[in-house]
Curated annotation (Swiss-Prot):
Pfam families in the record: Ribosomal_L9_C, Ribosomal_L9_N
Family: Belongs to the bacterial ribosomal protein bL9 family.
Name the record gives this protein: Large ribosomal subunit protein bL9
Taxonomic lineage of the native organism: Bacteria, Pseudomonadati, Thermodesulfobacteriota, Desulfobacteria, Desulfobacterales
GO cellular component terms given for this protein: ribonucleoprotein complex; ribosome
Keywords assigned by UniProt, alphabetized: Ribonucleoprotein, Ribosomal protein, RNA-binding, rRNA-binding
Function summary: Binds to the 23S rRNA.
InterPro entries: Ribosomal_bL9 (IPR000244), Ribosomal_bL9/RNase_H1_N (IPR009027), Ribosomal_bL9_bac/chp (IPR020594), Ribosomal_bL9_C (IPR020069), Ribosomal_bL9_C_sf (IPR036791), Ribosomal_bL9_N (IPR020070), Ribosomal_bL9_N_sf (IPR036935)
């Protein structure tokens, strides 16, 4: 089923573009949430007329993402974890743990924007990219340090 996006969806595309999606996805998610409309000739004309508005919205989203990227450029996130050897962690550090550590620093991000290729299993310093917009991906520094043992 062909749909026209009314807002940017990370896994699909940007506002104003036409996509072919599964009918169930369109009927059960995109249409009820107001994220897309069916791609009929009449709706295509309406979207063409509103194209300037969409372009303005895209520029605004990109500008906000670039401002956030500037804020994140020098961010350092320190996570304390239990270790069973000198450097091996008991569990692993996931994007959820990084999100929680950033939230503690008043940096609010969604977990899915943190592009951690695989969970971190050793102490050390890691560069982790954050996808804020399709072409805006700043990197933050994540330091994993051993938790002090209490005796």
């Amino acid at each position: 089923m062909k749909v026209i996006l009314k807002e940017t969806i990370d896994t699909l595309g940007i506002v104003g573009t036409e996509w072919d999606v599964a009918p169930g996805y369109a009927r059960n998610y995109l249409f009820p949430q107001g994220k897309a409309i069916e791609a009929t000739p009449q709706n295509r004309k309406i979207i063409q007329q509103a194209k300037a508005k969409f372009d303005l919205q895209i520029a605004k989203e990109r500008k906000l993402a670039q401002e956030m990227a500037e804020r994140l450029k020098n961010v350092e996130c320190t996570i304390k974890a239990k270790v069973h050897e000198e450097f091996r962690l008991y569990g692993s550090i996931t994007s959820h743990d990084i999100k929680d550590a950033l939230n503690a620093q008043n940096i609010i991000l969604e977990r899915r924007t943190i592009l951690l290729p695989e969970p971190i299993r050793e102490t050390g310093e890691y560069k982790v990219p954050i996808r804020l917009y399709k072409d805006v991906e700043p990197e933050i520094t994540v330091k994993v340090v051993p938790e002090e043992k209490t005796q």
